[in-house]
Amino acid sequence: CKIPRWDLGKFHGVDKELGSSMKSVGEVMAIGRTFEEAIQKGLRMIGQGMHGFVENKELVIADLDKALREPTDKRIFVISKAFRAGYTVDQVHELTKIDCWFLEKLMNIMDTSRELHSFMADGELPMIPVDLLRKAKVQGFSDFQIARALGLEQAMDGEEAILAVRNFRKSAGILPVVKQIDTLAAEYPAQTNYLYLTYSGTANDVRYLGDRKSIVVLGSGAYRIGSSVEFDWCGVQALNTIRQEGYRSVMINYNPETVSTDYDMCDRLYFDAVSYTHLTL
């Protein structure tokens, strides 16, 4: 799932309607085993304060129908608000002309969010069904999104809320696994160092636990105003130095435009988010 990063808010008076003219300054690429997982990961990777398709700060929109008709950089969050307000997939399709397949997948995320909201409690983590928690993680929900949906943010510090969900998730055995990307589309078996994390799996494709000969380099993410290829080149130079010193080099990044995400640049490339949850599992 590739998503452009628009920095239209930094340009005074710019038209925010999207068309054939390129207005993005960068892009991210998210990989998952479900569309729901990939789109939510991608929306977080953009790095503009959004946590996914749901559980964001509410947009103030005077006319939802008009906002749905206009293709802007915030359109996907307008769709989220419309679903929350009770719009159906068919209604949103009629206004946006977006294929119903995509809208059905986004509605799946909204339905799971509503299920989580039904367990909202005051002050402490409710005993939500493990199957629901696993379903949320498979659909790309972050620990923060789950904490916000359960109302934990209102009773405790944000970091405490995230840790409460994280600890419960780990105690239930809900952990991500490392999967290889098949660069040959199953034409024949292939072993690659092109990896990603997913909650849709039961076993790791590579062994990494106890590996003390590897050094991890964190990528700089999507290009944006003030951060471009020069920062990525620092990461590439770090990878080269690590290899020269006899260590295995590991890159974590999610920018498909960069040199550091060429999988021949390092021993293992994790095409995934650079976040606390992903770095510590």
Annotated model-derived regions:
Residues 1-56:
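Glycine-rich active-site loop/lid that clamps phosphate-bearing ligands
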Residues 20-22, 57-63, 114, 215-226, ...:
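Gly-rich Lys/Arg/Thr-decorated short loops/hinges at beta-loop-alpha junctions or inter-strand turns
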Residues 169-257:
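Non-catalytic terminal/interface segments that mediate subunit docking, oligomerization
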Residues 269-275:
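Short acidic-hydrophobic, aromatic-tinged amphipathic segments that line or gate anion-handling sites
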Residues 9-12, 39-40, 54, 144-145, ...:
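Short helix/loop capping segments that flank catalytic or ligand/cofactor-binding pockets
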Residues 33-75, 79-85, 91-128, 132-189, ...:
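Terminal amphipathic helices with adjacent charged low-complexity linkers/tails
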Residues 276-281:
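Conserved small/polar residues in nucleotide/adenosyl-binding loops
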